[in-house]
Each structure stands twice: as C-alpha cells, then as structure tokens.
Design a protein with these regions (language model features):
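Extracellular/virion structural assembly segments
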Residues: 1-208
Length: 208
C-alpha cells in the first residue's frame, strides 16, 4: 500500500484546551565587545521565531487518544500545525471590521492596513496579535484609524515577506490568531497513572 502523509499544517484537537503555556519570541542578535574598552557592536539578524511549550490538563484516555493521535501524525519535527498564544485569542482594541492589507510589497516592522471605521481610536492596542497569511505578529503600539479608515500598524517580528508574499487586500486575522509551528523533538512521550489519567506536554518552534 502507498504511504500516507497527512496534509500539513494540522489543526489542533478541540477535545480539551491547554492548561499552561510558555509562549515567546526568540531573536538572533550578535554582540561583540572590545576587551580593552568594553565598547559593544550589536547586529540584529533577520531571524526571529515564536517558541512555545504547552502543558495539557490531566485527562482520561479517551481524550488523550485524540491528542496522541494528533501528535503522532506530526511525525516528530517533520509535520507542522497551527497554534497561537492560547491566552490572547481576542484583541483588546476596538476593531470589528474586515481589515485588509493596504498595498503590496510591504516590508519591515510597519504595515499599512485599511477597512477600519473612519477616525476610530484604539482599533488595535499594544500587545494585540494579528495574523497575516500564515504568520503571527504582535502589535507594538496603539493604533488609531485616520479619516479614511486607514492606519499604519507597527508589529514584531518583522513581516515574513521573504517566506510568504503579502499581497494587497490580504485579509488580516485578529481573532484566534495562529502561526505555523513544528515540534522541537522527534520523541513523543506521555505520563499515565493507575487510574488512566494522562499527562501530556510538548514544545514547538515556528516553522520558517
């Protein structure tokens, strides 16, 4: 029989949520320091990557089976899946509209968007997440739309334009945002006790 390969990225099981998480961004910054003057030179490379560790709640084997099947299907670090910050699934800002990218070929840490209600304040607040195409960004400053419903939004990390093209009128997601991740380890392990309660955790990094 032919080998079966799942269609990646996979979607998380919904049988349970996450109990705890450690979620953050890892950067590649080189620092050299003179041994004589202690003066430093700093260079920020393009590499920036979301990383996370998720611990699931204790669960019975029927629920655990769905999670284990999902994790097995990733085949270690081979497969990918969609996930985001599980504690920040909605924004703090006032935006409710369909928001679009305003202009193609945008790069760096700022992106022009439109579709906001004209002159609306705090459409996004610092710390909100937005998703453009497959990737996740955090808004780094409060955003107010101008009289045309347009705004420049400052984000971290830089736009992933070297990985995915960001086209004009691309829809911007700001609820249940995710990025694409893969497991950090090729080993999959879990804990059980005498009453078949399972403990499952996994670590992952953004797929770039």
């Amino acid at each position: 029989m032919a080998a079966y390969t799942p269609s990646y990225p996979l979607t998380l099981p919904t049988v349970t949520g996450v109990r705890t998480q450690n979620f953050g961004l890892s950067r590649v910054v080189a620092v050299t320091q003179s041994p004589f003057t202690n003066q430093q030179q700093v260079y920020e490379h393009e590499g920036a990557q979301w990383k996370a560790t998720f611990t699931l709640p204790p669960m019975k084997k029927e629920s655990a089976a769905q999670w284990l099947a999902f994790l097995m299907s990733l085949r270690g670090s081979r497969g990918t899946f969609k996930i985001g910050d599980q504690d920040r699934k909605t924004i703090q800002g006032t935006a409710t509209e369909t928001i679009l990218v305003n202009g193609a070929a945008q790069t760096g840490n700022a992106i022009n968007l439109d579709g906001f209600t004209a002159s609306r304040a705090n459409v996004f607040l610092a710390g909100d997440y937005i998703q453009i195409n497959s990737y996740l960004y955090m808004v780094s400053a409060n955003v107010t739309a101008d009289g045309s419903g347009e705004a420049t939004v400052y984000v971290e990390p830089s736009l992933r334009t070297g990985i995915e093209a960001i086209n004009d009128n691309t829809t911007v997601v700001y609820t249940n945002t995710t990025t694409i991740m893969r497991l950090d380890s090729n080993e999959l392990n879990w804990d059980t006790d005498k009453v078949s309660i399972y403990g499952i955790s996994f670590s992952c990094s953004e797929s770039l």
